[in-house]
């Protein structure tokens, strides 16, 4: 009985995605030929919905339209792997990534 209660409770509460799924998200994002890196991955599951947020590191010289298109392609690939997922992608020029302070809770996501 306790296991049923625990599973029901887990389903209602937000949970960070397991490490294996987070690693898969990183592989998917970094697989795009124009992505130079990614960081600040945040992921969670709330009920049946998966939420994915990350920063893509892109070439400084891309136009806004090019960067937007790359972001869309990564988003669509993630949504294909996680149907129904809410995906938010922030784009960073590669030159500013080293200068950004990293919050302690994200140190392992660089």
Where on the chain are the PLM-derived regions?
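Alpha-helical transmembrane segments and adjacent TM-loop junctions that form the membrane-embedded core
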Residues: 1-110
